[in-house]
Structure formats: C-alpha cells, structure tokens
Amino acid sequence: MISREELLSKLSQVLPQPLYKEVEEAVRDLDDEKALRLVYRVLKLYVTSLIDPGEAIGIVTAQSIGEPGTQMILRSFHYAGLREFSMARGLPRLIEVVDARRTPSTPLMYVYLKPPYNKSREAAESVAKKIQQVTLETLAKEVDVDYVAGTVTITLDQEQLKYRGLTLKDVEKIVAKAKGKDVAISMRGYTITASLTTPDILKIRKIKDKILQIKISGIKGVRKVVLQYDSKNDEWYIVTEGTNLEAVLQLEEVDPTRTYSNDLHEVEEVLGIEATRALVAQEIKRVLEEQGLDVDIRHMYLVADAMTWSGRLRPIGRHGVVGSKESPLARAAFEVTVKTLIEASVRGEDELFKGVVESIIAGKYVPIGTGIVRLLMQF
C-alpha cells in the first residue's frame, strides 16, 4: 500500500498549489486510512471537473454572467427605493470593470492594518486621521471674501485642529510655502489672509478656491475615511473615498498584503498585472453578490484572463480584447462593421476561419466540440 507521504508527493504534481495545500492541511490530523480515502476522493473530483478539449467555455461564461446581469437590471428597477439594489452599485460598476475605465465613478481603497492598529477603534482611527487629506477648507470655520479690497480671510476652527492633531505651527509652516503671482498670504493667530496687489473680482474667486485646497496633512487624493469592523476576523479596517495606493502602502501601520484599491489601472501600475487580474474577478463577483446573485468564480477569472493575458489591462470591446483578434470578420461582427472590413481590405488581411464567429458567418464547421476533430485517411 502506498504511503501517505508518497501519495501527497504525487498529488502535489497534479493538483493546483492552493488546492494541494488545503488537502495537506485536511489530512494532517487523520489516520492513514481516512487520509488516503480523502485524497483519492479529492483526486477523482478534480479529474472529473477538468474541461474537455473543445468545450465552449466562452459561451458558457457569457451566459453565466449575462443572465444574472439581466436579473440585476430587473431587480434594480424593482427595488429602486433601496440603496443596496440601486443601479449605481450594480450594472454601472460592472460596465466600469469590463470596460476597464480609466477612472472609476467612485474610487475607493480598502486599507487593512497590522496588529495592534487593527484591534481597537482608537488605534485604527489614529491611522485614518493620518491617511485622510486635510485641506484649509476642512479646517476653516469661516471664509470671508472682500471683492472691493481684494482679500480672502479664513478663520480656522480650533476644534478641528485639535481633532486632527494639528497645531498652528503646522498650518503656518504649510501656508508660508504657498506662493502666487500678485498674491500676499499672511497668518496671524487663527486667521489667514490672502491679498491681491491689484483687486480683481474674477481673480479673487480663483484665489479663494486655490487657497482652500492647500493640503495641510494626510495623503493627497484621499477625501474621506470610514472605519469598518470585521466581526468575522475581529479587526478594524479603513475604507477611503479617493485613492492613492502607492502612498498608503508606504505607511508602516498598513498591511500591504491585503490593502487594495478598486481602481484597476492604479492597481496595475502599483501592484502589477497579476493583482489586476485578481481584482477584476473579485470586483465582478462582489457586484453580483451584492445583488444576491451567485456565479462560479471561474467564470470571472476567464473574463479576467482575457483582459490581462497580454501583460496589460485591456477592456472587453473593439478597443481591447475584440479589437485585437486576428480575424477581420470577428472584429467586424462586433462593432463598426463597414469601417473594420474596409481597413482589413486595405491592409490585405487574411481570414483563416480559426474562430467561432467567423466560422458561423461563413457557414463553416465551428471549431468547438466535435468540430475540432479532423479525420485522417490511413493508406
């Protein structure tokens, strides 16, 4: 009888690493007989779950995501009064992901903390204050504009300064660095005054807006922070409105192995294409689960693979995955048909009929299922 160690060694060469680690963990406390039965059972299930050659996984994935997507639209209209079923959280976000939009409509970061900062609300709040961008507008109690004299006067809120852990010297140091053409900025006590050398109504309004946006502390781009408690893992984490993943990951209190942004392009630039692939699948799954829809994660990963296999994030569409197909007929079948065919003709492209779409258009055997079989004559 084969030993447990030999079987696990052979199993590690067959199973994917994450699945193998789960099996290894599960058999650790079992006797040899039960361990072998479990391993054989897992191996049988794994082998029978593999896709057969020629399986039309693309259309299965499209149906598996598209049909629940239709339900999501219907539910969104039906439950229009409920925030959790609103269109803004469902279909629009799904479109943002598959279109790989450059800027999401609601950029967010999920900032996870290292112990002990994640074990108490006070410790997590101290990190949140460190992350949130604080501008003069945040600290302002009162803003007065004198259009005749050409001055902007800002009165600071003492309670806000105390809450943010800032002093007048901190603010004064930042304000002293602020410079502008034909503008003089001074600070006396809790009052900041900006004066134009030559009064100008239009210019003074622009000066007011710029001064209020001067960053005093925090990370640029992070407009709001909200503390969240995860009861399952007994920890506090931070959700931010606005993202700056690279800057946040440099904080020693932040756990870089779990912190992420919902901005696909930012994740690609900071963490790489593999992290982007995982995020695409995770975001699609999260959007569907929020609507109470259960879809196998492997369908999401197939979409993610199609968007990232080239090493760069590409949208699903004529400017990305579909537009990069070798077949001119497949490209033409998606959008802008006439233009695509004319351009393909000018370049003298060949149609090899290797894909599904172009084969259907031409009435040829589709290269899926039994269509991939080619019989050879034996002489």
Swiss-Prot record:
Enzyme class: transferase
Catalytic activity: RNA(n) + a ribonucleoside 5'-triphosphate = RNA(n+1) + diphosphate
Superkingdom as given in the UniProt entry: Archaea
Subcellular location: Cytoplasm
One Pfam family named in its UniProt record: RNA_pol_Rpb1_5
Gene3D superfamilies: 1.10.150.390
Gene Ontology cellular component list: cytoplasm; DNA-directed RNA polymerase complex
MF-aspect GO terms: DNA binding; DNA-directed RNA polymerase activity
Chaperone among keywords: no
CDD domains, per database record: RNAP_A
Protein EC: 2.7.7.6
Cystine pairs: none
Subunit structure: Part of the RNA polymerase complex.
Similarity-based family: Belongs to the RNA polymerase beta' chain family.
Protein's job: DNA-dependent RNA polymerase (RNAP) catalyzes the transcription of DNA into RNA using the four ribonucleoside triphosphates as substrates. Forms part of the jaw domain.
Protein name per UniProt: DNA-directed RNA polymerase subunit Rpo1C
Annotated source species: Pyrobaculum aerophilum (strain ATCC 51768 / DSM 7523 / JCM 9630 / CIP 104966 / NBRC 100827 / IM2)
